[in-house]
From Swiss-Prot:
This protein binds to 23S rRNA in the presence of protein L20. This is Large ribosomal subunit protein bL21. It comes from Thioalkalivibrio sulfidiphilus (strain HL-EbGR7). HAMAP family: Ribosomal_bL21. One of its GO terms (biological process) is translation.
Length: 103
């Protein structure tokens, strides 16, 4: 059984036991979170597509850890002006393990 969930402005295809990184969630490590924004639930040939969400669809997950992604370097440069601006950014994420899919 698999599902497509939306969280943090992105969509993820998940199955039970999957470990994935999502945008930072406000939950402690070890806590259980529920994703109610389920767009699709499938099991073999039986596929339920929501309009926009599947009624009664729910995905539960356990928060494994919080962290920060790799540093992305941003360089802004103006030619012939002796001007260069260099910045870095690290995005916060939450690592979750999918424990159940219903719907």
């Amino acid at each position: 059984m698999y599902a497509v969930i939306a969280t943090g402005g992105k969509q993820y295809r998940v199955a039970q036991g999957d470990v994935l990184r999502v945008e930072k969630l406000d939950a402690e490590a070890g806590a259980t979170v529920e994703f109610d924004n389920v767009l699709l639930v499938g099991s073999g040939d039986d596929v339920k597509v929501g309009t926009p969400n599947v009624e009664g669809g729910k995905v539960t997950a356990t928060v494994k850890a919080h962290g920060r992604g790799e540093k992305v370097m941003i360089i802004k440069f103006r030619r012939r002006k002796h001007h260069r601006k260099q910045m870095g950014h690290r995005q916060d994420f939450t690592e979750v393990e999918i424990t159940g899919i219903s719907g």
